[in-house]
């Protein structure tokens, strides 16, 4: 009986040590925040998604927080998906509904969300079409802006 208690205690201490060691390793890495910008909409100097993301990324970089900001170099969904490696969260600032950058990439992005990456959608990026896009937004964020239903 005493021997099994020692084994159990050793196992518990070993398991706890692994969790603590893993947490300390993860804490050393800055939180990677990936910014996706949609194409400009509503005319010149209106809804400048990339400019907005640049301002937010710069503010985070200057904040002193332990973060690494990455602006996707193209407008729209990234061509090089390695940008998502080790991401803590993805910030999306784009036109919504039929013009949403995620519409053609729902399955890819869903896999990213299911891996534990967070998502922040800004302004019209919260607007999804009914059907699969809306369902995914519900899963990822708990809601979405629905045309003819949501009212500001």
For the regions a language model picked out, list residue spans one by one.
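N-terminal secretory signal peptides that target proteins for export/translocation
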Residues: 1-6
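Aromatic-Pro/Gly-enriched surface loop or interdomain linker
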Residues: 27-87
């Amino acid at each position: 009986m005493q021997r099994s208690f020692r084994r159990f205690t050793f196992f518990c201490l070993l398991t706890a040590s692994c969790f603590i060691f893993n947490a300390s390793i993860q804490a050393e890495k800055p939180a990677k925040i990936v910014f996706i910008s949609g194409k400009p909409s509503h005319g010149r100097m209106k809804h400048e998604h990339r400019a907005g993301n640049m301002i937010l990324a710069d503010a985070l970089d200057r904040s002193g927080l332990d973060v690494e900001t990455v602006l996707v170099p193209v407008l729209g969904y990234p061509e090089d998906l390695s940008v998502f490696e080790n991401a803590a969260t993805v910030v999306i600032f784009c036109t919504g509904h039929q013009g949403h950058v995620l519409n053609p990439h729902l399955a890819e992005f869903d896999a990213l969300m299911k891996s534990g990456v967070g998502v922040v959608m800004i302004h019209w990026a919260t607007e999804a079409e009914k059907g699969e896009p809306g369902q995914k937004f519900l899963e990822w964020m708990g809601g979405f802006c629905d045309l003819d239903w949501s009212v500001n």
